[in-house]
Design a protein with these regions (language model features):
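Conserved AAA+ ATPase "SRH/arginine-finger" region at the nucleotide-binding site
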Residues: 132-135, 250-261, 469-473
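Walker A/P-loop
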Residues: 94-134, 440-472
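Conserved small/polar residues in nucleotide/adenosyl-binding loops
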Residues: 478-480
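Conserved alpha-helical scaffold flanking the Walker A/P-loop in AAA+ ATPase domains
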Residues: 83-88, 150-172, 215-222, 431
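Conserved catalytic/switch belt of AAA+ P-loop NTPases
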Residues: 148, 179-224
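A short helix-turn-beta junction within AAA+ P-loop NTPase domains corresponding to the substrate/partner-engaging
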Residues: 127, 239-260, 464
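Alpha-helical lid/collar subdomain of P-loop NTPases
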Residues: 1-75, 79-83, 226-229, 257-431, ...
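Structural recognition of the conserved hydrophobic beta-strand(s) that form the central parallel beta-sheet
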Residues: 173-175, 199, 228-235
């Protein structure tokens, strides 16, 4: 039935996204500021251009023809999504972006560019973006207000980031709304009527006959910024997308990248050569195909998204001789998978010609990297292999000019760290990700394997201050 009415690929179908068009065949052509809080959108169409005046933010508008310079790839699919978002915005609707599920051609684990489109949308309309990451136990009250303590020890209510954004006219990105379940419907008054009921009779509404202000007045009716917009995102569709939620938001199904688009984006963002990426692409295609089969067991393993591909590609662009097997095995957290699933991933890597260094065979043998102890010299941290050949050199952190107060936070092992090849190899990998690629790290391992010791040694060698926070199960996000 869907095929007969051309809806088997979702609203507009895949042809619309490949052509870069929005709803009903329109394409965004130009965005021009009209006043401090409004802009004029020009949509191009074969039947004639359409001009619409819409709310906008206070920041300078980024011209449409310069969006490619914002470190993103403005592909036809992204431009189609962006045009559709602007059309829904011109109708005064908040948006809920979910991955498309109807198009069998594009079933994959590739990115659907939801976050990228949100930031492009904000750049075009001059909105500051307030991203609010949601978690399962948050209540409707916590979304709007939270408890705080004054210097005298008294507890008071204060506005949550969502309320402050509504007060100041920001673009709110509610990330992961699927975890809220029925709690999401507690925001219906905000999305549909632009009203919020707060503490002690304090109300926020766009109809208030008072001047706009960045501060709330307790017990009074305050004016909400008329240009506030909310965009919710979720990685999957489920029971949370009820009839009530569908009335709150205009739902936009974002299709994932095709294989050709994803490959072009990864190459553009990383600069990696085509030949270096070929075996990785072969593995990714095989992994995603197997992960869609619940009988294999990979459906519970870590998905292989586009962001992970870009991270791996950046490493290969910088160090082409890196151990690809180790990178992929570590990226998918295979050490924490069941033995049978781990063996499946291992066999898939071998099937596409990716083997760990030291096991390729007599004619393709690549010895594993064995490092000597790292050396600090001339303001840099240097790693050498056992033959004395330099492998990596990075500048140490200049805390004297960047963070003078952090000198006391630099770890000092007082010479109690003893070098061995395995730990030095791990430190080498940490320095690559932390200093050269500017990545955040998650170091996982059983208790007593030296995680803290290794990180302290890395930071001591880099001369970087460390802020240590001991986590426990009773620690809430607000406390952090």
């Amino acid at each position: 039935m869907l095929t007969r009415v051309a809806l088997h690929g979702g609203v507009g179908g895949p042809t619309t996204f490949r052509a870069g068009r929005g709803l009903v065949g329109y394409t965004i052509e130009r965005v021009v500021r009209v006043s401090a809080t409004s802009a004029r959108l020009t949509f191009r169409h074969d039947g004639g251009d359409v001009h619409v005046e819409v709310p906008c933010g206070p920041r300078p508008l980024v011209p449409l023809d310069t969006l490619d310079q914002e470190h993103v790839s403005l592909t036809p699919r992204v431009k189609s999504l962006l045009t559709t978002m602007l059309q829904l915005h011109s109708l005064g609707r908040d948006i809920c972006m979910v991955p498309a599920t109807l198009d069998a051609e594009m079933r994959s684990q590739a990115s659907s560019s939801k976050s990228t489109c949100i930031h492009l949308f904000a750049a075009l309309l001059g909105y500051p973006v307030e991203t609010i990451w949601l978690w399962k136990d948050v209540s409707g009250t916590e979304l709007l207000m939270r408890r705080a303590t004054t210097p005298s020890g008294a507890t008071i209510w204060e506005p949550a980031p969502l309320t402050l954004s509504a007060l100041r006219g920001s673009l709110v990105h509610l990330a992961g709304v699927h975890v809220l379940g029925p709690t999401l419907e507690s925001l219906s008054r905000l999305t549909q009527d632009r009203e919020m009921e707060l503490w002690d009779g304090t109300r926020l509404t766009t109809d208030a006959d008072v001047p706009l202000s960045n501060e709330l007045v307790d017990g009074h009716v305050c004016r909400m910024a008329p240009n506030v917009r909310i965009i919710a995102t979720a990685p999957q569709i489920g029971d949370w997308l009820s009839e009530g939620v569908a009335n709150m938001f205009a739902t936009l199904a974002a299709p994932p990248m095709t294989a050709d688009e994803e490959r072009a984006v990864v190459r553009q963002q990383s600069g990696v050569s085509e030949t270096a990426l070929d075996p990785v692409w072969a593995f990714v295609h095989k992994y995603r195909t197997q992960a869609s089969d619940a009988n294999v067991g990979l459906h519970k393993a870590r998905r292989f998204g586009t962001r992970q591909l870009i991270r791996i590609a950046r490493r290969l662009a910088r160090w082409p001789d890196d151990d690809v097997y180790r990178l992929l095995f570590r990226n998918q957290l295979c050490d924490f998978l069941p033995r049978t699933v781990r063996d499946i991933v291992h066999q898939m890597l071998l099937d596409v010609g990716i083997a760990p260094h030291g096991s390729e065979g007599a004619f393709q043998y690549k010895p594993p990297l064995r490092l000597s102890a790292p050396v600090v010299e001339a303001g840099t941290l240097a790693f050498f292999d056992e033959s004395g050949k330099p492998v990596l050199r990075v500048p140490r952190y200049d805390w004297r000019s960047k963070d003078p107060e952090g000198a006391s936070l630099i770890p000092n092992a007082h010479g109690s760290f003893f070098h061995n090849t395995q730990q030095t190899g791990l430190m080498h990998s940490i320095v690559q990700d932390l200093e050269t690629l500017d990545e955040h790290l998650l170091l996982m391992g059983a208790q007593g394997t030296g995680k803290n010791k290794i990180m302290d040694q890395v930071l001591e060698l880099l001369d970087r201050p460390r802020e240590y926070i001991q986590m426990n199960r009773d620690l809430s996000l607000i406390h952090i």
